[in-house]
Curated annotation (Swiss-Prot):
The keyword Cytoplasm applies. It is found in: Cytoplasm. GO terms for biological process: ribosomal small subunit assembly; translation. It comes from Rickettsia felis (strain ATCC VR-1525 / URRWXCal2) (Rickettsia azadi). Belongs to the RimP family. This is Ribosome maturation factor RimP. Gene3D superfamilies: Ribosome maturation factor RimP, C-terminal domain, RimP-like superfamily, N-terminal. Its main location: cytoplasm. InterPro entries: Ribosome_maturation_RimP, RimP_C, RimP_C_sf, RimP_N, RimP_N_sf. Required for maturation of 30S ribosomal subunits. One of its GO terms (cellular component) is cytosol. CDD domains: YlxS_C.
């Protein structure tokens, strides 16, 4: 059985894609009222604006009202996934080749559960990282969570835009 987050993903993802957005993450936070937090990114690499979040929010809200997946009262928050966005799909690793990433694993790999390094390659359900002077091969299924890292190099590129 699918979680409510997966059900929401299923009903909104295509519409967001049609609007030029990637659905990054759906999660619940808070209790009374619940908050449905939805993180989006641009498919073309552009920055996400407040207007983008507003447009996406209106579309998502209309879909959720029709689908009626959430029983209790809730509020909807749509936001940019940010500079240190989570990587939640295998395809994300190919999109961000060469970028620095922090990865937390579900279990030990070479005596560690945390790795930070540049994404060298993502192929056959494996992530190849350059960590300091060594290459680390991580099975995608071992990843608990991963986020991009805001490095000085990325920051300088942003300042030039």
């Amino acid at each position: 059985m699918q979680t409510i987050e997966q059900q929401i993903t299923n009903v909104i993802e295509e519409s967001l894609t049609d609007m030029g957005f990637e659905l990054v993450l759906v999660k619940f936070k808070g209790v009374n009222p619940k908050v449905v937090e939805i993180l989006i990114d641009s498919l073309n690499g552009e920055k996400i604006s407040v207007e983008d979040c507003t447009k996406a929010s209106r579309t998502i809200s209309a879909i959720l009202d029709v689908e009626d997946l959430i029983e209790d009262a809730y509020s909807l928050e749509v936001a940019s996934s940010g500079l240190e966005r989570p990587l939640v799909k295998f395809e994300n690793y190919n999109r961000f080749l060469g970028r620095e990433v922090k990865i937390k694993l579900k279990e030990l790999l070479n005596g560690k559960t945390r790795y930070q390094g540049k994404i060298i390659k993502a192929k056959n359900n494996k992530i190849y990282l350059k960590c300091e002077e060594q290459e680390v091969l991580i099975d995608y299924d071992l990843i608990k969570n991963a986020n991009l890292v805001l490095t000085e190099e990325v920051f300088k590129k942003l300042l030039k835009q």
